[in-house]
Amino acid sequence: MGKVVGIDLGTTNSVVAVMEGGKPAVIQNAEGFRTTPSVVAYTKTGDRLVGQIAKRQAVINPDNTFYSVKRFIGRRSEEVSEELKQVSYIVKTDSNGNIKLDCPSLKKEFASEEISAEVLRKLVDDASKYLGESVKQAVITVPAYFNDSQRQATKDAGRIAGLEVLRIINEPTAASLAYGLDKKNNETILVFDLGGGTFDVSVLEVGDGVFEVLSTSGDTHLGGDDFDDKIVQWLLKEFETEHSINLKSDRQALQRLTEASEKAKIELSNLSQTEINLPFLTATETGPKHLERSITRAKFEELCSDLINRVKIPVENALKDAKLDSSKIDEVVLVGGSTRIPAIQELVKRILNKTPNQTVNPDEVVAIGAAVQAGVLAGEVKDILLLDVTPLSLGVETLGGVTTRIIPRNTTIPTKKSEVFSTAVDNQPNVEIHVLQGEREFAKDNKSLGTFRLDGILPAPRGVPQIEVTFDIDANGILSVTAKDKGTGKEQSITITGASTLPSDEVERMVNEAQNSAKEDKEKRDKIDLKNQSDSLCYQSEKQLKELEGKIDDTNKNKISSMISELRNAINNENYDEMRDLNSKLQTALMDLGKSVYEKTSKEQTSTSSPTNSNDSVIDADFSETK
């Protein structure tokens, strides 16, 4: 088995880590940073940019720069109406209600999984270069409160990226692995994970290699992006009040405001006040308009008061489901960049009566935990037992539109449970199984995971046929459902017809497209490398000719000068075959030149050092000692 990496696929930033010498280590990306922005962009020429380079050009290319895509993965448009307002790119909906990201540069629409796959591919490519071997397997983290569709979509993203996803692991659980790896004493910990797009709380028992999740709760519509948006909306109002200009439809201005708001939020974690200066934000017939505003930490907390208060409910629910009060929590572990907000830290301290433990890096701890789980699966890490739970109840729709729960939330996984149902009318030939996820009493208020039919039920009075419905959740938290007629033995597994995950043939198409684009990317990169190498060779050759002026004959000098000119022409004309050929010939000619110069110099030195007059006579001398 090759190296298995752990990946924290984040809303704002992503991190990759690996076990090295029995210890988890974060892998730097090609740019030398430990975190990679979860941003993908397409230029006017169709080039794909991923990470920091994509984020840097977002202001001048807002329509083709995709960020915070994790908020859309595995979801329908009606589930993310607020999130859709926060991005500068165009989001569309297909005939099934699934989200598509419009890319004007390529005249193409992307699924969220495809964009996430590009981020994963970048992380894996950088890890492969670092490790010196191709990485094909990974453990990927997801928010604990992700539903089945979102988990399956994340797994699909891994597959599109060319990865075998060995395990989907919950982010708070991964953080607990990193925190408790060397802990021998038993502790009850609460992991408070506020990231860029989601919020999770998990209560765990940790100690001596056993990590048992007691409960989990969360809010997948709450994260750092929402805090940024509060500042953005405030700035929009301030600007409109001052200049009577509404910037809400100006995508470039919105992108600049979003970046400035994120920067201000980060600065206010350490400063009591910061400045937001955006010159030339827009222009009218009267001239350019600038934005200059000061924002205090108190003002920021006032703007975000409703968001800050929203974190209370999941914390209370997690404690309630774990049947614990705050006094039983030994440590509170903060995870996610948004936990650096002082008001969040104060709230945690107030509701749990405990100072949060800040010994772990909130940006890296999830990836480190994923690497530990990867090490367990690869056999590198021993004596660790991880017992996770399903975050939401699972059930089916029964008569009257009611949700009948089969697996309650916070059930330890993997698990398998069955319930027997019957027909509602006489001689009913089939039953439709509508699979649901959520805590509401009625089917219409819960998340629909899909429907399937069991046909061929023998004619019988209602209530007589016995239909056994089995729910099976694997270690990834992904569900499969079967229905079996106990009378005939006929069985049917779920076929998703309405869930917000991609059909298998669509995933297959994306996998093939990704493989082809990876090949094209390599060819394009090889050409760029060849061009740079040739340009560098021309420069070095010209430099060498100047240094050897007077030491080489005109024939060799003219020959190499001619080759340099030919190579420069090939570079300018982008003739890569000729470039490759001339590159090789010029290198050989330079080697021969160097060899001839060395031999010539060596002969001259030998000639100079030879004695001109040999005299072997010995001179006698008398020495006297003076005292």
Swiss-Prot record:
Pfam family, one: HSP70
Major subcellular location class: plastid
Disordered as annotated region, ranges: 597-627
CDD domains hit by this protein: ASKHA_NBD_HSP70_DnaK-like (cd10234)
Compartments where located: Plastid, Chloroplast
Biased composition (Low complexity): 604-617
PROSITE patterns registered for this protein in UniProt: HSP70_1, HSP70_2, HSP70_3
Leader sequence residues: none
InterPro entries in the cross-refs: ATPase_NBD, Chaperone_DnaK, Heat_shock_70_CS, HSP70_C_sf, HSP70_peptide-bd_sf, Hsp_70_fam
GO molecular function: ATP binding; ATP-dependent protein folding chaperone; unfolded protein binding
GO cellular component, one term: chloroplast
Keywords in alphabetical order: ATP-binding, Chaperone, Chloroplast, Nucleotide-binding, Plastid
Function: Acts as a chaperone.
NCBIfam families: PRK00290.1 (NF001413), PRK05183.1 (NF003520), prok_dnaK (TIGR02350)
PANTHER family: HEAT SHOCK PROTEIN 70KDA (PTHR19375)
Similarity remark: Belongs to the heat shock protein 70 family.
Protein name, entry field: Chaperone protein dnaK
Organism this protein belongs to: Guillardia theta
Taxonomic classification: Eukaryota, Cryptophyceae, Pyrenomonadales, Geminigeraceae, Guillardia
